Amino acid sequence: MKPAKNPNLVEIPKPKGLPVIGSLHHIDLESPLFSLIELIQPLGPICQLTFGSELNIFVSSIELLNELCDESRFQKIVTAELEKLRHVVHDGLFTARNEERNWEIAHRILMPVFGTIKIREMFPEMKDLAQQLCLKWARYGEEYVIDVTADFTRLTLDTLALCTMGFRFNSFHNGTVLHPFVDSMVRTLKEASVQAALPNFINSLRKKSWRRYEKDTAFMRKLCQDIIDKRKSQTDTDSHDLLAALLRGRDPKTGEGLSDDSIIDNMLTFLIAGHETTSGLLSFAMYYLLANPQTMEKARQEVDEVSQGSPIAVEHLSKLPYLNAVLKETLRLQPTAPGFILSSPKDEIIGGKYLIPANIPIGVLLHMVHLDKAVYGEDAAEFKPERMLDENFNKLPPNSWKPFGNGMRGCIGRAFATQEALLIVAMLLQSFTFEMADPGYKLKIKETLTVKPDNFRMKAKLRRGGTATDFQRELQSLGSVGAKLSSTPSVTSAQTGGGDKKPLTILYGSNSGTCEALAYRLASDATLHGFYARKIAPLNAARNSLPKSEPVIILAASYDGLPSDNAEEFFDWLNTAEKDSLKGVSYSVFGCGHRDWVATFQRVPILIDDLLQRAGAERFANRGLADSAVMDLFVELEKWTTDSVWPAISQTDGKQDNDGEGKLISSLLKVEFSQPRQLQQYSHLVEATVMESRSLTTPSAIGKKMHVDIQLPSGVSYHPGDHLLVLPVNPIRNVKRVLSRFHLTWDTIVRASGNESVRIPIETAMTVHELLSSYFELAQPATPRDIRVLAAAAEDEATKQVLNNLATTSYLEDIQEKKTSLLDLLEKFPEISIAFGTYLTLLPSLRLRTYSISSSPSWNSSRATLTLSVLDEPATTPGSKRYLGVASNHLAGLTPGDLIHVATRPVKGIFQMPADLSKAPTIMIAAGAGLAPFRGFIQERAYQQQNGVQLAPAALFFGCRSSHDDLYRSELDAFESSGVIRVFRAYSREDVGSKSNTRKGYVQDSLQAEKDVFVQLWNAGAKVYVCGSVKMASQVKDLVANLVYTAEPMDAQKEFTPQEWFKRFEKTRYAAEIFT
């Protein structure tokens, strides 16, 4: 390659080659990687080689790699071994090309499965198989010669298959014989490497090898298909592993799923790439530990200090920084995925002098990059874990350590591999001492697609002696895995202020009441850490008055990118605050949101944080973040305050009081029994009267929907589409369960004192029935903190262990996903005794619920109706017969004459009904109870028609399951016959026959079928309204964008995608109200 005219460019070095084959004769087919390294090492940080007619560039310095990792200039390409593996796994995550659609779909579906919470959830399965390995070595005895890579291959393959697919290879129960899948996989990887090193014409002559390759591929895919078929046949499974995500998951962006072939592609990708690299890491780690006895002893001491002799638990893993550094240093010296290949779509210059032509493969050889002496020093080839400890690792230049690849195409399973490796090495160091079977062994490398030690053997001896049976009992013991609580915890009486507690201010911005409930939970926790909440208030209450004498904690959410109603004034004030005007304010922000609203996710919390900084306020803890799509908000708040807030503002020499759960056992909320009192309510709520309550569905319907008609008091008004806030009452069944658990009668009088952060009237008597019905969320899933309190109160060690597991490893599956409440746990463990005040302190305050009003004030200005789905479904927690929605069951149980406490709230933004119905065509799209606001719109249209207004056309697209839940059918038919509206329906679970304007399918299908109607209205200037679930709204939006796109003249939009083109209409002609 000749340098271009630019005088600063130099030619990239290259070795001498032969005609036709170039440098191909230098490559050893048994060791292609290291023969390549040997060839290019003398050529410097960059070189070029030709293999036949193909030009390749290779880099070996961190300085050049740092430029290559810029994804705006260079992207991963699939060549060499990966290209050959496409015959086996096609466009799986590892081998897909950047532009392939299946990669995008699979990546978005699988990212949540490999999140931190999900990986922690897999810990029990990982530990199960690690124990099988340990038992094998214990049973074979200290003279048994261990084939290290073979046993680690068994372990990592079994672990990956069990954790991600619920399939057991049972590799430790088949003697020395590996599962046939392993033989097929090893041959396939080797064949892919050989094919990549040979020209295509030579590969075409290797008929026997090709037939073996085809046979192995067919066997592995058949095994995966069998696993899929078995899972599909298990209709009662509630698994949430990788296979479940592949089978049931839908792309959150497009709504698409994956075919069986694509699922098999990704199953094989994870089984092949995932277990091979991790088994290599474990093998190399054991080699380096044995070759460096002092390092092994230091790692073992760390494991012993953290575990304190108890079995390794998931919470131990984050407390092993030195062992983590051992694994990082192992991957630096021996990256088991030894490189990746990039290219650029256009000519690029790197290092200021090397021209990289467009579309030329650039190989990154990590075994050379990771030994760059300019970064790692003259001892770069030595094994020194200290250089990988956090304080040193964080000082490395960017992109100095890349064993998991780069950027968007980096390894999705990094967290899985890290947890697995940490667990296994920690258990091995805790259980055994080791020695090399051959003391003179020198490291040799075996290459396939990955690298592993070749012929590495060792011996293992139980550290504490005894028999394998003794060791098995030890492994399976139920020793405590958490911090040990004192049997006589110190108890402090609650204080609302003064004394030795310091004040803080808690402010919240929330429309739905979630951040408000979080604020009161935070206030309750504050008393455990030396603080009391002097003020708990909406953000608007702090406009112009942020205190400078105490910490301020702000909890906020975004609503279509805007602040909540009770934060608007504060937000506007903050936007105009002058520089340094808030100097002296000490604050931190916790943001709530949902990732499906990508464009505005966490926007308001981030802006509040930035604006406070700009005005001179000082952040005492980094902003907390909770994503309700994948997180429990109460759990994330608990984590954030425990890890960041309380340590930052603690009053005692910067040390956090960690005995909060112990204190809660004795209860900070003191309860006395006295006389009843009159109900006190939220000041902004008014008393309304139920006029009618009726079912909208037949007894044959799946799920129940209700219509509730409410008489509003004088002076309360609303507009079509506005919301009604409702103060609910807990279902009597749940209240009775609490009374039974604490042996109380419904009319027992209670009086609470001592903790004003718990949102109930203090020093006021009321019946316990009233207290439980009106003030607390009884069905809220328990948080890990709640469960730890129960564990601290438990006297039985086995019960403590079970609860500690529920608070950690199995929390997501057994608590959050099953909606297991604190009450459920107290019923499950009746032997646990906690004070009634403790129970109340742990519960969140009862929240207001928000409903769309389903009527127009033109129909009756003093009446408002609600249309709602009643949540009453089988409980997933054993012992709890039903899971009941709090507000929906309360409303469904009301009868004419019942009183209810409500408040109207204006709808914000562009969801307001058009002001002039004679000029603005309207398109309404709804599913189920999402019809509510549009019934109000239609009533308003009918009223105006009756008063002589010539209505612009309007259409309603409505989806439901069947004719049994076709809401307001006769009413809508009457409106349609009078020309108020055109209605197009979709039944998802009933054949429609010849019914007019009705389709089998979902509301999206009806919209697609009637696209001409939509386009005609759109071209006439229609505004589109959508109301329903997140999934429905997302799919409808994509469809609407495509319909609008195709309706526009091609020369106007040809440079844009449908979604890009549609953005120009989102703030003026498209409005969505989404219920989660």
Swiss-Prot record:
Q: Which GO terms describe its cellular component?
A: cytosol
Keyword Zinc on entry: no
Give disulfide pairs as residue numbers.
none
Please state the gene responsible for encoding this protein: CYP505P1
Q: What cofactor does this protein call for?
A: FAD; FMN; heme
Q: PANTHER family, from UniProt?
A: BIFUNCTIONAL CYTOCHROME P450_NADPH--P450 REDUCTASE (PTHR19384:SF127), NITRIC OXIDE SYNTHASE-RELATED (PTHR19384)
Record's function text: Self-sufficient cytochrome P450 monooxygenase that catalyzes the regioselective in-chain hydroxylation of alkanes, fatty alcohols, and fatty acids, giving sub-terminal hydroxylation by acting preferentially on the omega-3 position. Produced 9-hydroxydodecanoic acid as a major product when dodecanoic acid is the substrate. Produces the omega-3 hydroxylated product, 11-hydroxytetradecanoic acid, as major product when tetradecanoic acid is the substrate.
Q: What is this protein called?
A: Self-sufficient cytochrome P450 monooxygenase CYP505P1
Pfam families reported in the protein's UniProt record: FAD_binding_1, Flavodoxin_1, NAD_binding_1, p450
Top-level division of the source organism's lineage: Eukaryota
- Residues binding heme are 411
Q: Which SUPFAM superfamilies match?
A: Cytochrome P450, Ferredoxin reductase-like, C-terminal NADP-linked domain, Flavoproteins, Riboflavin synthase domain-like
Q: Does the keyword Heme apply?
A: yes
